[in-house]
């Protein structure tokens, strides 16, 4: 059959010789079908002459062979097969082999197979075969922006991980090592604390500690070098922390040097509220609004990394859900078109899997009504920062367990938290191995997991959270109306007042400027709830009433008016 008659979207699969191990081959064919290919499985333990005849009579462009027995015997069979292919002039095909690592070393020297698989390859190895064959290759065959990358990997999520070591040289080398491993799609550069706050102030930054919490980026050349080091392997996108001041200057610099894949900007945080920024809450919010608007004008995706910060400080589950809506609403009102909703699982520490999952579902549901043709939401999941143990063996299991639940919400982005997170800054090897764990789960489970959202206990809790989160939002809106704001979501004064008054509050905020820090919370039956000084759970309506900030919302007169309206 001539090359012109071959079907580029048809794959012929077969186990060679006496090999009966079909698991790896059938997985290869299954993944191919998910990318839109047609597949034909000839069978197991098929002699080379029979395979040759099947190939000659098939229009398949891609031929997938598997041999997972004794390498010495396999090498002899493969040499016989290659000789027959060349003798019979079965040309114009692409041949792939799955085998044991020892045999892969020998067969790679034969210069015949387009790709040899030994098991455990990252998803991008399959993507390279199945997705890129029909594309016009540029210098990088991988999409260079987040939206295209997400679409090209569907139904699989793209993978993101943090990386940044106290040494510039080690970070440069690590970026290249991670890129060449092809285990992820986005590397989030973690700059040190001095770079986040003082990059544009050289007289100050030179006096600050170097390498505290990340890589000591000090010049534009450092940023350019980071990008250059990433342009290999599967050409991962880069992104970086937005900083704690000079956000617009940072945005312009990161866009030009790193081609920043998306920006992560909070509403309340990275300010005096948590001690990680120099500005009072109100001023920080205004700066955050300006930065979000800058990115929105350029159609650069935005992640508002705010809700999980409340959860990490043991705010109630419903407060985290309310902030999920508030964050998305602000982004939409500021003109963001591509919005990334971060969903941190296992937060706060101590919540049960099912109640934690209910919170995540509530966060998704409360944002859903905002979606329209001008506002697209991508779901980004991650393992809880406080969830991981210092023992790496335990932490690996925790990553796997958390990821299984994450896949149940069909994320567009999976943020891989390295298993070393609780003990030390992730090395390239830590990042690569953590991503391998997650990639394996994704390959095995992306379309084959039970739907936990139908669990009755989860549904009940999700609905409770939606109702209580709505009470917080209604209180916030009424509070804003009393302050004279038509849209309180875009008022830094109203937002900072909501924290100052305790409407948004967390136990671990006590003592921080601009926060109340008086709420008491406990983990009860796997849920993070507000409690009285006696340890009894308080519902959200009672908590808000006790704050005395929106009294008329709960007054008898207002209640009677609402009854009359409903009648």
Predicted regions and their residues:
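Glycine-rich phosphate/diphosphate-binding loops that line cofactor/substrate pockets in enzymes
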Residues: 1-8, 52-59, 149-153
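Surface-exposed amphipathic alpha-helices with a cationic face
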Residues: 33, 78-90, 222-233, 290-296, ...
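Catalytic alpha/beta active-site cores
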Residues: 45, 49, 69-72, 93-96, ...
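Long alpha-helical, hydrophobic tracts
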Residues: 278-282, 299-433
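Catalytic-core signal marking the mid-to-C-terminal active-site face
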Residues: 430-567
């Amino acid at each position: 059959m001539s090359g012109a008659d071959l079907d580029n979207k048809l794959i012929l699969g077969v186990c060679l010789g006496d090999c009966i191990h079909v698991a790896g081959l059938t997985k290869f064919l299954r993944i191919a079908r998910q990318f839109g290919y047609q597949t034909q499985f000839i069978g197991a333990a098929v002699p080379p002459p029979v395979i040759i005849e099947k190939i000659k009579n098939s229009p398949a462009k891609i031929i997938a062979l598997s041999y997972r027995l004794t390498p010495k015997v396999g090498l002899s069979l493969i040499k016989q097969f290659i000789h027959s292919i060349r003798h019979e002039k079965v040309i114009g095909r692409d041949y792939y082999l799955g085998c044991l690592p020892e045999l892969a070393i020998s067969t790679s020297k034969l210069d015949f197979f387009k790709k040899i698989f030994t098991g455990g390859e990252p998803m991008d190895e399959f993507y390279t075969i199945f997705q890129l064959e029909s594309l016009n290759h540029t210098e990088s065959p991988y999409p260079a922006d987040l939206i295209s990358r997400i679409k090209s990997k569907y139904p699989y999520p793209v993978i993101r991980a943090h990386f940044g070591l106290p040494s510039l040289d080690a970070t440069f080398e690590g970026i290249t090592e991670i890129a060449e491993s092809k285990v992820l799609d986005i590397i989030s550069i973690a700059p040190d604390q001095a770079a986040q706050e003082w990059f544009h102030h050289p007289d100050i930054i030179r006096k600050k500690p170097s390498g505290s919490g990340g890589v000591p980026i000090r010049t534009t050349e450092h940023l350019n070098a980071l990008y250059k080091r990433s342009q290999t392997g599967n050409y991962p996108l880069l992104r970086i922390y937005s900083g704690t001041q000079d956000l617009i200057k940072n945005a312009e610099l990161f866009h030009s040097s790193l081609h920043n894949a998306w920006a992560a900007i909070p509403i309340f945080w990275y300010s005096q509220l948590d001690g990680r920024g120099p500005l009072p809450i109100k001023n920080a919010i205004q700066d955050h609004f300006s930065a979000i608007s800058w990115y929105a004008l350029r159609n650069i995706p935005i992640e508002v990394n705010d809700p999980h910060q409340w959860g990490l400080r043991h705010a109630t589950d419903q407060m985290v859900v309310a902030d999920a809506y508030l964050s998305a609403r602000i982004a939409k009102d500021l003109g963001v078109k591509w919005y990334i909703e971060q969903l941190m699982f296992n937060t706060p520490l101590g919540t049960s899997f099912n109640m934690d999952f209910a919170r995540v579902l509530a966060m998704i549901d409360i944002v859903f009504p905002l979606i329209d043709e001008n506002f697209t939401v991508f779901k980004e999941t991650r393992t809880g920062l406080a969830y991981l143990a210092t023992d790496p063996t335990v932490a690996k299991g925790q990553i796997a367990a958390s990821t299984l639940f994450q896949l149940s919400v069909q994320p567009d982005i999976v943020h891989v938290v390295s298993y070393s997170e609780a003990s030390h800054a992730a090395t390239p090897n830590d990042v690569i191995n953590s991503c391998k764990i997650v990639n394996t789960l994704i390959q095995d489970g992306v379309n084959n997991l039970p739907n936990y959202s139908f669990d009755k206990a989860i549904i009940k809790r999700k609905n409770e959270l939606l109702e209580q989160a709505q009470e917080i939002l209604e209180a916030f809106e009424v509070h804003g109306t009393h302050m004279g704001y038509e849209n309180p979501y875009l008022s830094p004064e109203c937002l900072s007042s909501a924290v100052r008054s305790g409407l948004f509050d967390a136990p671990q905020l006590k003592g921080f400027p601009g926060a109340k820090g008086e709420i008491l919370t406990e983990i009860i039956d796997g849920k993070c709830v507000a409690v009285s000084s006696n340890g009894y759970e308080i519902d959200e309506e009672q908590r808000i009433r006790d704050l005395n900030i929106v009294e008329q919302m709960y007054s008898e007169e207002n209640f009677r008016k609402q009854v009359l309206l409903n009648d």
